Amino acid sequence: MDVNPTLLFLKVPAQNAISTTFPYTGDPPYSHGTGTGYTMDTVNRTHQYSEKGKWTTNTETGAPQLNPIDGPLPEDNEPSGYAQTDCVLEAMAFLEESHPGIFENSCLETMEVIQQTRVDKLTQGRQTYDWTLNRNQPAATALANTIEVFRSNGLTANESGRLIDFLKDVIESMDKEEMEITTHFQRKRRVRDNMTKKMVTQRTIGKKKQRLNKRSYLIRALTLNTMTKDAERGKLKRRAIATPGMQIRGFVYFVETLARSICEKLEQSGLPVGGNEKKAKLANVVRKMMTNSQDTELSFTITGDNTKWNENQNPRMFLAMITYITRNQPEWFRNVLSIAPIMFSNKMARLGKGYMFESKSMKLRTQIPAEMLASIDLKYFNESTRKKIEKIRPLLIDGTVSLSPGMMMGMFNMLSTVLGVSILNLGQKKYTKTTYWWDGLQSSDDFALILNAPNHEGIQAGVDRFYRTCKLVGINMSKKKSYINRTGTFEFTSFFYRYGFVANFSMELPSFGVSGINESADMSIGVTVIKNNMINNDLGPATAQMALQLFIKDYRYTYRCHRGDTQIQTRRSFELKKLWEQTRSKAGLLVSDGGPNLYNIRNLHIPEVCLKWELMDEDYQGRLCNPLNPFVSHKEIESVNNAVVMPAHGPAKSMEYDAVATTHSWIPKRNRSILNTSQRGILEDEQMYQKCCNLFEKFFPSSSYRRPVGISSMVEAMVSRARIDARIDFESGRIKKEEFAEIMKICSTIEELRRQK
């Protein structure tokens, strides 16, 4: 029978049909090879937008720098970065006038955070530029290396464990005439193997000391490493993103803390909240504009797009904003916050790996590192690359490029949002002093502008006024990419608004399915995704039930764990059938052991082990939850884990799921090949670091402690905590006298060992 597809939508309101327009099946594109070209594009574009600025030379590093601030006012619609200081300051003043006390209160909150933040805050985050090794490392390792180098150079304020003291060391390090660092290198030598008597290559890891003079150290401290942004859909060209080093990160964190605190108090800000909270906040602004417009008024909404937001922002402007926001605050506080924008005004971008050349005829490949781009003959390059290199050469210093204007992606999201909101704030009637007025939403570079006016001419005038006001602070609304609609239909940060926010369930489709971590985590993540979509994305009960059945099917095929009584033959079916036959209570078997699925849409919030615990045979319970099971290398047992789920659009989201550790929570062993490389020492450091942190977290579960602000080592803190806990447990009868005595003895032994050390 032929079905007329339009019949499917007869009962569906038009806005719900958005889920049928889903374009993102298949894998997103990933980048291969070097990011050097993309980084050069970014640098060249940024300088082009600011080309009418003033050139100066940095006295410390010798880097040429372009300063577009207070440059010529724009005469055309081309994007430009010539922000006017007095306009930015005035926008800040009006923002404060509309929100009395907002800056004052946020400063007080930030000061409290600064006093309490521990240096381990910097271990969060993934790849970080490690200036000691001149390449990317996991954040924890990069921090450990930095602190190690600081201490060996006599900088010891960081030993208190407070982030602010570590930052004191950073500032002091910049005044030192030289810094001594340790670098890793590999030695290969041929030796005879005793067993096989064959010659083998033996690799040993050497460490050598290297001295950096003041200039070289400063260049490294101000360097952002660049990579290509992966998995970006809907783009033909890739683009570069930056990862800053440890010297910059701490200062940026405090600036963003202040800006976040301000954003929380601004109703037009789409940051730092997300999800349903964000939708509610935005719906409020729309409602306000609708109710305040008179019946005769027109109301239009612009779904806005800005041209190259980051590349037209300027750190000097952020410095002006911070100077204004903190104007009545103590000197130390103002200094700490102004360092991040100053460092960004003097930043250097690392060009990455360089170019790879290959000769088809001679089957030769050779890498041209970024350091060589300054001197190499350009005849080897094609025309577009040649142009890029010519443009960039005056800015090159040791394989890094001086990049004073522009911000690089994702560095000051909160602070740039404050700037955007300050322009939206100027749309009130008392500031426009005419018949049109505006309000809107801002989230980093994304915005929606709601304009009310008595007639179309008023709307047009309002758009023009908004556009020009933005230009004055270095924001370039793109007239080509923004579109205007009657209020009631617009898009903002991938939320579609049509008389209320529409649930675009198809955006979540890529996160359905089996994640491939391990049997235990995959089951938990799978049902949590379905549960979350029922809560947040209008996933109806029938569809959810179907999604669940498809997921279980997918899961069984992935792990070859079809029910014990099935006819399907796989590698595992022999073992699973045997287990099925010898199990009395078959309902108690986990799905991954060939058991039945007991999930339905009512019990998705219960981990499978808990759901089936009462139904399990006793010996099965014993095998399943046995920490001594020799076949399993256990993950640390946490009650909640974090999974990374990929929506179709926007950044990967972190999602919490319940983790019950069983023999199914295995982790694959690490690839051995890393153990023979120069990375090995780093890997061991990282594991030790991880173990210490895990141990510490065991003593201070995050629910029960505010991190110690006093100056005590991790060991001292854990010992004192153990003593307190033991006493409480002993007095309440939870532990016996002998156990209490044993704990006290262990604590004393640890202290004794520390004293001897």
Swiss-Prot record:
Source species, domain of life: Viruses
Record GO cellular component, one term: host cell cytoplasm
Positions of the RdRp catalytic domain: 286-483
Alphabetized Pfam families for the sequence: Flu_PB1
Residue ranges, compositional bias (Polar residues): 55-64
Free-text description of this protein's post-translational modifications in UniProt: Phosphorylated by host PRKCA.
EC number: 2.7.7.48
Motif Nuclear localization signal: chain residues: 187-195, 203-216
UniProt GO BP: DNA-templated transcription; symbiont-mediated suppression of host gene expression; symbiont-mediated suppression of host mRNA transcription via inhibition of RNA polymerase II activity; viral RNA genome replication; viral transcription
Subunit architecture: Influenza RNA polymerase is composed of three subunits: PB1, PB2 and PA. Interacts (via N-terminus) with PA (via C-terminus). Interacts (via C-terminus) with PB2 (via N-terminus); this interaction is essential for transcription initiation.
Protein name (database record): RNA-directed RNA polymerase catalytic subunit
Organism from which the protein derives: Influenza A virus (strain A/Japan/305/1957 H2N2)
Species classification: Viruses, Riboviria, Orthornavirae, Negarnaviricota, Polyploviricotina
